[in-house]
Amino acid sequence: MSFRHFKRRLDTSSADESSSADEEHPDQNVSLTEKSTSLSHSDLGGEILNDTGKNRTPNDGQESNESDESPESEESSDNSDSSDSDDMRPLPRPLFMKKKANNLQKATKIDQPWNTQDDARVLQTKKENMIKNIDKANQVAKNYETMKLRLNTNYSTNEELIKQCMLLDDNDEVDSEKERQKWFERQNERKQKHRRIQLAKQRESEEYEAKRFEAM
């Protein structure tokens, strides 16, 4: 009985000392408890990570395979979409724009370098066009001058005729015998002219008949 009583006293004394130590150093006890809890949490986290790593290894392989296959499927779908879009794409309507010769030559010089033959050909065409334009202008000026001269000459001839007509003396009472003699002379000239014309016609008809008779 005395031994039990002594052991109980020792237990109570150790408990009192521990409680007094706890009261004297509360911060140390709190830090120790925090360290123990952190260690327990870290151990639990490591175990969880190991478990998840073991469980997720096949899934990761599947996901990598799916990620490897996904670009190929996307490329194939893009190719099919692009081919369909190329087939179904409407053709643009052609637009014909008019440009001046100078602008066209500048654009072609900027876009592509010309050869010496092309330059010579262009210069030749320019020269020919210039010569044609000059000839055309000269022809127009010449036609204008000729028309002007014709008008002037017609006007001058008409004026001269009018002057000559005004200078004619048609008064027969001044010298009637002389006027009558001139009239007879003009009449004889007309008769002789008519006779010459008739003789020429008769001679032609006789020659025609003679040729026709020889042909028979």
Curated annotation (Swiss-Prot):
Residues 28-41 have a biased composition (Polar residues). GO terms for cellular component: spliceosomal complex. It is found in: Nucleus. Residues 63-85 have a biased composition (Acidic residues). Residues 1-93, 172-216 are annotated as: Disordered. The keyword S-adenosyl-L-methionine does not apply. GO terms for molecular function: RNA binding. Keywords: mRNA processing, mRNA splicing, Nucleus, Ribonucleoprotein, RNA-binding, Spliceosome. Its main location: nucleus. Residues 177-190, 201-216 have a biased composition (Basic and acidic residues). Belongs to the SPP381 family. Component of the spliceosome and rRNA processing machinery. In association with the spliceosomal U4/U6.U5 tri-snRNP particle, required for splicing of pre-mRNA. Component of the 25S U4/U6.U5 tri-snRNP particle, a subcomplex of the spliceosome. Interacts with PRP38. This is Pre-mRNA-splicing factor SPP381.
